[in-house]
């Protein structure tokens, strides 16, 4: 099964929010070569896999506003070096949650790539403040977009 088949170890105080199951989405440009396994094209898919395995390997959880650093740029053609999870943009109301037949819910999160200074800003402030600065940024990945924290 996919990531949503695994129940994540969500802190007890958040149990009421049904955050144990998640699936990830990333918006790539229509001309992105998803079949090219060179790192300049493959890193978004690699990160979907890394993130899907992370809660299992670390017995932890991923949710809204969480960031994961790479420590270095994803590929030679971009300075992006980390990701943040947000609610999917440009979807119909309610499309960010899927109700399962047994009553459990799967939450969908959009993966957005960040620059190192944006990661640092989020850690120093919070996800909400960073997203406020990103309100003009397209939800579609643009490896050449300007940083919102320079």
Predicted features, each with a name:
Residues 1-21, 25-150:
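Acidic, proline/glycine-rich low-complexity IDRs
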């Amino acid at each position: 099964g996919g990531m949503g088949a695994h129940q994540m170890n969500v802190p007890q105080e958040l149990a009421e929010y049904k955050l144990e199951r998640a699936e990830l989405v990333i918006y790539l440009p229509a001309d992105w070569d998803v079949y090219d396994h060179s790192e300049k094209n493959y890193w978004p898919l690699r990160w979907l896999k890394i993130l899907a395995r992370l809660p299992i390997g670390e017995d932890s959880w991923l949710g809204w506003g969480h960031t994961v650093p790479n420590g270095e740029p994803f590929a030679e053609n971009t300075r992006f070096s980390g990701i943040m999870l947000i609610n999917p943009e440009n979807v119909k109301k309610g499309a960010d949650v899927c109700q399962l037949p047994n009553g459990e819910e799967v939450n969908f999160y959009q993966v957005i790539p960040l620059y190192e200074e944006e990661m640092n800003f989020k850690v120093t402030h919070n996800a909400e403040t960073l997203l406020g600065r990103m309100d003009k940024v397209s939800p579609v990945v643009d490896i050449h977009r300007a940083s919102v924290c320079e």
